[in-house]
Structure formats: structure tokens, C-alpha cells
């Protein structure tokens, strides 16, 4: 692969990644060409390659110039002829002038010929081409074309694997036929053979698929198109005179007379679509729709153009001896012209004897007459499967957040069966529905104070116009694309109204009779919901869907789109497993990078929140946090874990935290006017108000005690500020005396607390503690107060906090009782808090996985997490236009470095690539400098034009030592070749200021300069007292968060077992596998069958200790009796 040349150790991430990826690609046997000018031998091989391809001079010169440029900047590992093939393909796909003074795309040089002459397989080409696109900085439209080309190849490879067994099911084995004798030109033409039909049917299918661009990379529709081709060829084969030599007599779709079972003979060819669907994972309704609207009109056009010869009225006769040779030849020629004109892959290579070498997969059909597979064929089939798994083109990987409760697909499940199952589930969900609101939904909408029915209908109409405009047919393509778009949108409308009704019903159950007009009038909610429905429909037809295309055409910000995903999953129980995985994957993409784009509304929400990012502890329920350093007791008095920090989190949050979040919470914004200078709301939490919290940055402003004088300095609070009174505080004076004093403070404009001088009794005299008020730096706020920050005295805050509000009239209003963990709850229900709760959980899961693979201890993992949280809270601009994984990997490296447990970037990225969401672009193309809008920075919360500009004042104030130069990776020198393109100067560089580089450049130039001061607090050289406490780490969920419906016909669900105290045992029956008696299972079956609930006496829960509804158990005898009942239950269950 490509790697920077002349880099000192350790190597840059691109080089490290390349070498390891090449080992996966199997290129280790090839020699590597060092960076520099290409040798004469390479140029000679290139000239020979161009001569064999009959390449024109312009493409030849451009390809060689591109290769020279790449070889001077990168070390091209592997066969140099393979890299030359990539350069030639790019040059061949450029627009060239024509004789008619127009332009044509490509020079009609086949990609298949390029690969054959360069002795490169398709899988190798796709792997090399992705790296060449990164090095050459090719424009997005070219990358999209390559991705579509690879997707078409993957779809065809998967379908070809299905084509073989289906063909062998309805036709005889091609190996069983006798070899044909040589005949003269004037001899009578012989009937076609099964081998010829095998080739003809496949070529006819791929030619038809190529002429339907909207379904060429659509797995479900392409598969049904194949079934249509087999159905047509099979029907024609039954009318041949030698049909007994062609058709498999064991095929279950026909009777002995050659016609489908349960049908009457007719002149039209028989239709076996329904039988093929039932035998081979097809959907009858979809297949018949493809046959009627796509296949038959297209085949009729082929008859009109004389590409197929026979009876046009019933589409038969092309397999007759007089027509087959001409038809086969004409279709082959037409397909060759299509491949040369479009630069597409020649998918006939699947039929060749050298398919193993050309595709890197397998050869056609079975390699031996016995029907067994050879070892080479099995090996090549495994290679294809590895490529499919690695490319993730047709399958949805389990998100890392779900690997604990979602298993990978079974080996026997194919991509086709998975896709058809998803589509079948969609049809089941929409059965009997129409693309209009139901009577119940209409009634619900009319009951709102402002009926949104008309607004909803108008919005859907506008979105349909926008959606259909993106599927306008080309001149050479039929109107099928728009018909397909109409069909998808109609399904999405049905799903939209169905989910909307479920969402409103759930909201009414949670909120009671509250008017929902406010939520139902939100344009972002409805657009996001319909876009989500369209994504589900698109995914069901063509995995992995069209995200983010659908959200972008409707101009739905990703920050708003993510909010509806969980709402959608909770409201629709009929979603199949793959769809849920896909939606979870989309949510992860939004959380880790899409929501952090420059123009994202997220930055507006942060600005509305007074430019403050909440910490993990503030947005995460306490029972979802790791607290190994303390005993966490609900309702206990507030005990600050960090010196100099006033905490307002609660111990027991009740059920409201774990309950599903309402739409009001998801689409709410941080309240500015009522909470800007208040610690808590005036309303009690029980009344549904949003409780306030002390802002995370800065928390406390300290008053350094310089001397102890006899003067008393009075402080007059400003009206509108919040007066904070500490019940007790301990002050140690210079003479060693320790006294207890009252301490007061005022909430400052930054949201923190400024303590002012108070009267102190030292040695029997009333004296005042005075001094200048100086705010602490962000680093000091995260840690303890050092001797440089508080001199002469030590201030400790062990007691509860009382909050007083100063009214404009100068009076202090008591805002409640002293602050305790049982009476105060952080604000956790705003849309911004919900977003960061998910971000922290996602980051915690990924970091835990990386630390496990890197063999990092739990102690270091928590330090890494604290560093990562610091970067998010104090320096959120580091995430702008960047990726969450980039900050995680940098945090791992820097904390491992300062704690003397070095982990190289190469090793970190090697483990990162094993995660399902990993992409090479994450560490190869990181934003270094770009045009940034003003929004905030680490210290003054205002973004710099470049994140490399540091706040020198903050750096000079901090007393922490500077990180040693040998603790960082070397910065690439100008003379050395960068591992990835640094400045976008290619065709896609619309922003001249934007500069990108690899992860190490980002670390050295930006990340280290903003994090090093904080990170060095955890170094071994730093004193233990100056080490900030560690941030709490989020727990990893161990169970599935949603229930699963077993059958669409019966309301039977499987869900994680909940706490017994939150359920009503008298209305439910529980069966515990390998624990409950068999009688309990019979009662459940009886209740499902009859609909009657068993009597209370028979509903005693013997297994979990629940009390009998008929008779109470004495508390003192409860445990002994429970043990005896449990023993009886176990004995009965074992029989």
C-alpha cells in the first residue's frame, strides 16, 4: 500500500495501516517499490501493458504522470503493475472529445482487459483502487463510481452463487451432457445444450440488469430479475424438442407433461415464478411485479430490435435450433458494447474457466461430474466471503454497542435470504394499510388544540416532489426509476402514519391528556420521521440503504435525524433484526462524526447552553456509572468527591430517568432565560420541571487568602445573582490553627461560584479573610487547589450547601432546603443532555473494547476516559469536522505515554481496525486546518480560525511542566513525504484553506498542544495531591434494550426480565427456564390459547419470592418458607 517515505520511527499511521492491510490482502509476496522516481524496468513494463491494451497516447501519458507523482510521494507496496493498472483505469475514465465535437466518458478500454493484462484479480483491484483514490485525492464523483462498481460486482457475485443451485434445480447438470461432435458449416444446426443455456441465461440477465441502473446494485430486485430470467428460459426450454435432455425431471414445479402443476396447458410459456420463490427465498409479489413492469417490457424490446429471435407475441422460440445461435451472439455483442461504453465490469468472467484468477473467487458451476467441490474452489469461495465480510457492502455489521446482545448471522444465512426476509417483514407490517391516516389517527389529530392534519399532508406532498425529482429518468432509460421511487415513497407514507399513530399513543400514555400540538407542529420531527421511514424501505430493498442521501435531499440535519431513531424503534415492534441494526449503525455515525459538522445545529445548542458541554456524570443516571472509589448511597448528604468543586448530582433518580424519553424532551432546547444565573428551578422536580445544575466549567472561583487582618470586607450581592451559603468550612491559618467558619459565595456570570471574604474568629478576635478574586484555569478546575492557588490557608467544604436567590429588591429568597443528593437532581432531559448521554456511552463502549485489545489496565482506562471527557467538555472544537474515534485514539496514546505504558499509534490503529465501524479515512484524513466559524474554544469558548492557535495566556498561567519532546511522535519535516495528502489541491478542493493530514499530524500539531497540560497531571513525576480525580466511567449494558415480537399474528414478546417491584405480578405469569415447573408453562400456553387469565391461587410466583395474592407471609418466616417453596419448585421442575 501507500506509506510516507523517509519517516522516522515510529512510522506514521498511514504507513502502519498500509502494511497491515496489505497482509490481509495477500500482497506480502510482492516486492515493494521504494519512494522515488520509477525505474526503467517499470517504465518498460508499463509500455508493454499499454501496447497490449492499445491505449491511446493521452491516457498513456496521464497514467504515467500520475504514477510518477504517487511513487515520488509514497512507497507503493506490492506489484507495481497493479498500481499502474489503477492509474490507467483513472485515465481511461476521463472525458474525451468525440468527432462530433462532443464528449464521451471513457476511451472504451475494458476494465476486464486492464486487469487481465496486469494479472490482477478484481478483489485486489478494488483494494488497491481505494488506496489510490486516497493518495491521488480523486473527486467524490469518481469515488462514488468506483463504490458503485464494487457494489455491482458484489451483488453479481452473491447472485451468481444463488444462480448455480437454482439452475441445477430446474435443469440438468452441464457436466452430464455428452461432448458435441465437430460439424461442418452446412450441417444442420443442433439443439442447444444445458451448458449453452447456462451461459445464455446469465448473459441475458446481466445485460438486462445493466440497463436498469436503479436496480443494478439492488440485491433484492436484481435477484428477482434473475428469477424472471430463469422463468423465461425455463418456459422456452419446455417448448424445445429436446426438453427431456435439458429439464431436470426432479424439479417440483412441473408435472410429467412439462407444465406447471395445477395448471392447464396453453400456448404461453408456463410461469414458475411462484415455485422458484418458495424454493429459493424469493418474494412472490415483488418477483411478479419485477416481471410485469421491468422484465417483460424489456424482453419485448429485445425482440423488436432482433436481438432475440422467435415469437414476439408470447416471447418464445429463441431456444429453437434456428434462432439460438443468432440470439446468443447478438446478446453477447450488445453486452460487450454496453461494458465498453460505461466502463462497467464484464460480469461474464464468472462463467470463465479462469474465474479464480480473474475474480479472486471461484469458477463456474461444479468442478467435477460427481457434484463435489474441489479444494481450490472451496478456497476461492472462502476468499470471496472474506471480501464480502471486509467490504461490508451487503451486510450490516453488529454495532459495537450491540455485540453483547445481538449475535452475528448464522453461517447458513445468505445475503439474499436476509434481504428478502427484511422485505417480507416490511410487507407484513404494511399489510392492510394505506398511505393516509387511519380513522383513529384522524380522530387523535382532530382532538389537538390545533389540528395538524392539513399541515402533515402538505408536508408529505412537498417531500414527495423533492424525492421524485431525484429519480427523473434519463433519455436512454425507461420511466421505471420514477415508478420505483413512487413505490418506495408510498410504502414510506404507510409506515409513517403507522409509526406516528403509535408514537402519539405512547406519548399520551406517558403524559396523560397533555396537548401534543406543540410537538406535532415541529417540522423537524415530521421530516425526520418520514426520512427514517424512507430509509427503512430503501434498506429493505437495497441494503445497506441510502443514508445519508435521504436525509440530505430533505435537508434534515443529522442532529435532528438521530432523535427520531429510538422513537421509531420503540414505536414499531415489527421491525426485523437487520433493520434495527441498520438504524443503530446510523445513530452511531451521527453521534461519532456527522452531528459534529461545522454547520450542524449542535453548535447552536451548545451556544444556547451558554457555551457549556455537560460532563458524563451530569447526563448519565448514577446507576449507569462506575463508582469504584466510593460507596454510592441514594439519599445520602452531598459529599464532594473533588476538592474545590460543588457537586449537585443526586443519588437516587427514581424511575423517570430509566423511562423512555418523551418527544418534548428530545426536541427541547436548553433554557437560557430562566436558568442562566440560577442553580435550581423554583418548581419542585415532582411537578415535572427541569431541575437546574451547577455548570461544569468553571465550577468554583477561589479566593486566595493572602493575610489575616482586622478589617471586615463587606460584599453586597448583585440583584439577580444566586447566593450560595456553605453550612460549614474549615480554614487552617498560617499559625496552624484550624477554625470552622461560614462561607458564602455568589454565582458568577460564567455559571460558577465566586466565594467572597467572610469573618473569621482566630485567637478570639474577629478577623476577615481577604484577598483578590481570581478565577481558576480549566485544568485547575479539574483537579485540586494547589499551593499557588490558595496560599496561607486551606479551605475545605465538608458540609451541605444552602441556596439563596437574591431578588432585584435586594431580598434573599430561600430556594429550598440544604442541598442533598435526595433533593436535587441534575438537568438530564434536554435534547443536548440526551445527545451527550449517547455520545459518552458510545465512546465508553469503544474505548473499553480498545483497552481490552491493547491489554490496558482498568486504572489506565479510567485515566484515558478522564482525558477524553476533558477534551469534549473543555475543548469541544476539537470535534468540529472530526471523528470521535480520532480523539479516543489520541487520548489512549497521550495517557499511555505520560504514565510510562507506551502504546504505539501503529498498535492502537491495528486494534481500532477490528472494530465494526472502523474506516481508514478516520486516521488517514484528519482535518488539520479549515475555515471555521466562531463558536467557542477551550478557554474563552470562541472558535479560532485554526485549532492550532493556542491560548497563550492559559498556557502561561498553568504551572504544570511541559511534555517532553520525546514523548510525542515526530512532526513530518517539509522534505519528507507525507503519508497522506495534506492540502486539498485536487479537483474536489472547494475550500482552499482546508488542510488535512493523518492522525499523527493532528496529534502533534493540534491535540497535544491543547491536552498536554492536563495530561501531565497524571504523570508519575506529578505529586499525588495535584492529580485530578478520575471521571466516572459509563457502564456497558448487558441486555437488549427492546422487546422482540415473536409473531406478527400474536402479541407475544420476548424482553429482558425487569425488576419485580416495577411490575404487577398479579397480572403476569413468569416462566424461568430450567427453574420453573412445567405446570407454569402449561398455564401460559393455556392463557395464550384461551385468552383467560389463571386464578390468583394458581398464579403464585414460587420462583422469585413474590407473595401470594391470597395469603400474606409473615415477615419473620418469609425467608425460611421461601427456601422450602423454592426447593419444591426445583424438584417439580426436574421431573
UniProtKB/Swiss-Prot annotation:
GO terms for biological process: cell differentiation; chromatin organization; negative regulation of G1/S transition of mitotic cell cycle; negative regulation of gene expression; regulation of transcription by RNA polymerase II. Keywords: Cell cycle, Chromatin regulator, DNA-binding, Glycoprotein, Nucleus, Phosphoprotein, Repressor, Transcription, Transcription regulation, Tumor suppressor. During G0 and early G1 phase of the cell cycle, phosphorylated on Ser-636 and on 5 sites within the domain B. Phosphorylation on Ser-669 in G1 leads to its ubiquitin-dependent proteolysis. Residues 806-818 have a biased composition (Low complexity). Residues 656-674, 935-950, 958-969 have a biased composition (Polar residues). Residues 825-1021 are annotated as: Domain B. It comes from the Eukaryota. One of its GO terms (cellular component) is chromatin. Belongs to the retinoblastoma protein (RB) family. Key regulator of entry into cell division. Directly involved in heterochromatin formation by maintaining overall chromatin structure and, in particular, that of constitutive heterochromatin by stabilizing histone methylation. Recruits and targets histone methyltransferases KMT5B and KMT5C, leading to epigenetic transcriptional repression. Controls histone H4 'Lys-20' trimethylation. Probably acts as a transcription repressor by recruiting chromatin-modifying enzymes to promoters. Potent inhibitor of E2F-mediated trans-activation, associates preferentially with E2F5. Binds to cyclins A and E. This is Retinoblastoma-like protein 2. The lineage of its organism: Eukaryota, Metazoa, Chordata, Craniata, Vertebrata.
Amino acid at each position: 500500500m501507500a506509506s510516507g517515505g523517509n519517516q522516522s520511527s515510529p512510522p506514521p499511521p498511514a504507513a502502519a495501516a498500509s502494511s497491515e492491510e496489505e497482509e490481509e490482502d495477500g500482497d506480502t509476496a510482492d516486492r515493494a517499490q521504494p519512494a522515488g522516481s520509477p525505474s526503467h524496468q517499470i517504465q518498460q513494463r508499463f509500455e508493454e501493458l499499454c501496447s497490449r491494451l492499445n491505449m491511446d497516447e493521452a491516457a498513456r501519458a496521464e497514467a504515467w504522470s500520475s504514477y510518477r507523482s504517487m511513487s515520488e510521494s509514497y512507497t507503493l507496496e506490492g506489484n507495481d503493475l497493479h498500481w499502474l493498472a489503477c492509474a490507467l483505469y483513472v485515465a481511461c475514465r476521463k472525458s474525451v472529445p468525440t468527432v462530433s465535437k462532443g464528449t464521451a466518458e471513457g476511451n472504451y478500454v475494458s476494465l476486464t482487459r486492464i486487469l487481465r493484462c496486469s494479472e490482477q484479480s478484481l478483489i485486489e483491484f478494488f483494494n488497491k483502487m481505494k488506496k489510490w483514490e486516497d493518495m491521488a485525492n480523486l473527486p467524490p464523483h469518481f469515488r462514488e463510481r468506483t463504490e458503485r462498481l464494487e457494489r455491482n460486482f458484489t451483488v453479481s457475485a452473491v447472485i451468481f452463487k444463488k444462480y448455480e443451485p437454482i439452475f441445477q434445480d430446474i435443469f440438468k447438470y452441464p457436466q452430464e451432457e455428452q461432448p458435441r461432435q465437430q460439424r461442418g458449416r452446412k450441417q444442420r444446426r443442433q439443439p442447444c445444450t444445458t451448458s449453452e443455456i447456462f451461459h445464455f441465461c446469465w448473459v441475458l440477465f446481466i445485460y438486462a440488469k445493466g440497463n436498469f441502473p436503479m436496480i443494478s446494485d439492488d440485491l433484492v430486485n436484481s435477484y428477482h430479475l434473475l428469477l424472471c430470467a430463469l422463468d423465461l428460459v425455463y418456459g422456452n426450454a419446455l417448448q424445445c424438442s429436446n426438453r427431456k435432455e435439458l429439464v431436470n425431471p426432479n424439479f417440483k414445479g412441473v408435472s410429467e407433461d412439462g407444465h406447471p402443476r395445477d395448471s392447464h396447458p396453453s400456448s404461453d410459456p408456463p410461469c414458475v415464478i411462484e415455485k422458484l420463490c418458495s424454493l429459493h427465498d424469493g418474494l412472490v409479489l415483488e418477483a411478479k411485479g419485477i416481471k410485469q413492469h421491468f422484465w417483460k417490457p424489456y424482453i419485448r424490446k429485445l425482440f423488436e430490435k432482433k436481438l432475440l429471435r422467435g415469437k414476439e407475441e408470447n416471447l418464445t422460440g429463441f431456444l429453437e435450433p434456428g434462432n439460438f445461435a443468432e440470439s446468443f451472439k447478438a446478446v453477447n455483442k450488445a453486452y460487450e458494447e454496453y461494458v465498453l461504453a460505461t466502463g462497467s465490469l464484464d460480469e461474464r468472467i464468472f462463467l470463465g474457466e479462469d474465474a479464480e484468477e480473474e475474480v479472486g473467487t471461484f469458477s463456474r458451476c461444479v468442478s467435477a461430474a460427481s457434484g463435489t467441490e474441489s479444494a481450490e474452489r472451496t478456497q476461492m469461495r472462502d476468499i470471496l466471503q472474506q471480501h464480502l465480510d471486509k467490504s461490508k457492502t451487503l451486510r450490516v455489521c453488529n454495532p459495537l454497542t450491540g455485540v453483547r446482545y445481538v449475535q452475528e448471522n448464522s453461517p447458513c444465512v445468505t445475503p439474499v435470504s436476509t434481504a428478502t426476509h427484511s422485505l417480507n417483514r416490511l410487507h407484513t407490517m404494511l399489510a392492510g394499510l394505506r398511505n393516509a391516516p387511519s380513522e383513529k389517527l384522524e380522530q387523535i389529530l382532530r382532538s389537538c388544540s390545533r389540528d395538524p392534519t392539513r399541515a402533515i399532508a402538505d408536508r408529505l406532498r412537498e417531500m414527495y416532489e423533492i424525492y421524485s425529482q431525484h429519480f427523473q429518468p434519463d433519455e436512454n432509460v425507461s420511466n421505471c426509476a420514477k415508478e420505483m421511487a413512487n413505490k418506495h415513497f408510498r410504502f414510506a407514507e404507510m409506515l409513517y402514519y403507522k409509526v406516528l399513530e403509535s408514537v402519539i399513543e405512547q406519548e399520551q400514555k406517558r403524559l396523560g391528556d397533555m396537548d401534543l400540538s406543540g410537538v406535532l407542529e415541529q417540522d423537524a420531527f415530521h421530516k425526520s420521521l418520514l426520512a427514517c421511514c424512507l430509509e427503512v424501505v430503501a434498506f429493505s430493498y437495497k441494503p445497506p440503504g441510502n443514508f445519508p442521501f435521504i436525509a440530505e435531499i430533505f435537508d434534515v440535519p443529522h442532529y435532528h435525524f438521530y432523535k427520531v431513531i429510538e422513537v421509531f424503534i420503540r414505536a414499531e415492534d415489527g421491525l426485523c433484526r437487520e433493520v434495527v441494526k441498520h438504524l443503530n449503525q446510523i445513530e452511531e455515525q451521527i453521534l461519532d462524526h456527522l452531528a459534529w459538522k461545522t454547520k450542524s445545529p449542535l453548535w447552536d445548542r451548545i451556544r444556547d447552553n451558554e457555551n457549556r458541554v455537560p460532563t458524563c456524570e451530569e447526563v448519565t443516571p448514577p446507576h449507569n456509572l462506575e463508582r469504584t472509589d466510593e460507596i454510592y448511597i441514594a439519599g445520602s448528604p452531598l459529599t464532594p468527591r473533588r476538592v474545590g468543586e460543588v457537586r449537585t448530582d443526586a443519588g437516587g433518580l427514581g424511575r423517570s430517568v430509566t423511562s423512555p424519553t418523551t418527544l418534548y424532551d428530545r426536541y427541547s432546547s436548553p433554557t437560557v432565560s430562566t436558568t442562566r444565573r440560577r442553580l435550581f428551578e423554583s418548581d419542585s422536580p415532582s411537578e415535572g420541571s427541569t431541575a437546574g445544575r451547577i455548570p461544569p466549567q468553571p465550577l468554583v472561583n477561589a479566593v486566595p487568602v493572602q493575610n489575616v487582618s482586622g478589617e471586615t470586607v463587606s460584599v453586597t450581592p448583585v440583584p439577580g445573582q444566586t447566593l450560595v451559603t456553605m453550612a460549614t468550612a474549615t480554614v487552617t491559618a498560617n499559625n496552624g490553627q484550624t477554625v470552622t467558619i461560614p462561607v458564602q459565595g455568589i454565582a458568577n456570570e460564567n455559571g460558577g461560584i465566586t466565594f467572597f471574604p467572610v469573618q473569621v474568629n482566630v485567637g478570639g478576635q474577629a478577623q476577615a479573610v481577604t484577598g483578590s478574586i481570581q478565577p481558576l484555569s480549566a485544568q485547575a478546575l479539574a483537579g485540586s487547589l494547589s499551593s499557588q492557588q490558595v496560599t496561607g490557608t486551606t479551605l475545605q467544604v465538608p458540609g451541605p450547601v444552602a441556596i439563596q436567590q437574591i431578588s432585584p429588591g435586594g431580598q434573599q429568597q430561600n430556594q429550598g432546603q440544604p442541598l442533598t443528593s435526595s433533593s436535587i437532581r441534575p438537568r438530564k432531559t434536554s435534547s443536548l443532555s440526551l445527545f451527550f448521554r449517547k455520545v459518552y456511552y458510545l465512546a465508553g463502549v469503544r474505548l473499553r473494547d480498545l483497552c481490552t485489545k491493547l491489554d490496558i489496565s482498568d486504572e489506565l482506562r479510567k485515566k484515558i476516559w478522564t482525558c477524553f471527557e476533558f477534551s469534549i467538555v473543555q475543548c469541544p472544537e476539537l470535534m468540529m469536522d472530526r471523528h470521535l474515534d480520532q480523539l479516543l485514539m489520541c487520548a489512549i496514546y497521550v495517557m499511555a505515554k505520560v504514565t510510562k505504558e507506551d502504546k504505539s499509534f501503529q498498535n492502537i490503529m491495528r486494534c481500532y481496525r477490528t472494530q465494526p465501524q472502523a474506516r481508514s479515512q478516520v486516521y488517514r484524513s484528519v482535518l488539520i486546518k479549515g475555515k471555521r466559524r466562531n463558536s467557542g474554544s477551550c478557554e474563552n469558548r470562541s472558535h479560532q480560525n485554526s485549532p492550532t492557535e493556542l491560548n497563550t495566556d492559559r498556557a502561561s498561567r498553568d504551572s504544570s511542566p511541559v511534555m517532553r519532546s520525546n514523548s510525542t511522535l515526530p512532526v513530518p519535516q517539509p522534505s519528507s513525504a507525507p503519508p497522506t495528502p495534506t492540502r486539498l489541491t485536487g479537483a474536489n478542493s472547494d475550500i482552499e484553506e482546508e488542510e488535512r493530514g493523518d492522525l499523527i499530524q493532528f496529534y502533534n500539531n493540534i491535540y497535544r498542544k491543547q491536552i498536554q497540560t492536563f495530561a501531565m497531571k497524571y504523570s508519575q513525576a506529578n505529586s499525588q495531591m495535584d492529580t485530578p480525580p478520575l471521571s466516572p466511567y459509563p457502564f456497558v449494558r448487558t441486555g437488549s434494550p427492546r422487546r422482540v415480537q415473536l409473531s406478527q399474528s400474536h402479541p407475544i414478546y420476548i424482553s429482558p426480565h425487569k425488576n419485580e417491584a416495577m411490575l404487577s405480578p398479579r397480572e403476569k405469569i413468569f416462566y424461568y427456564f430450567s427453574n420453573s415447573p412445567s405446570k407454569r408453562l402449561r398455564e401460559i400456553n393455556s392463557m395464550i390459547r384461551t385468552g383467560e387469565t389463571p386464578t390468583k391461587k394458581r398464579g403464585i410466583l414460587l420462583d422469585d419470592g413474590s407473595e401470594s395474592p391470597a395469603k400474606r407471609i409473615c415477615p419473620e418466616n418469609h425467608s425460611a418458607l421461601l427456601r422450602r417453596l423454592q426447593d419444591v419448585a426445583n424438584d417439580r421442575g426436574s421431573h
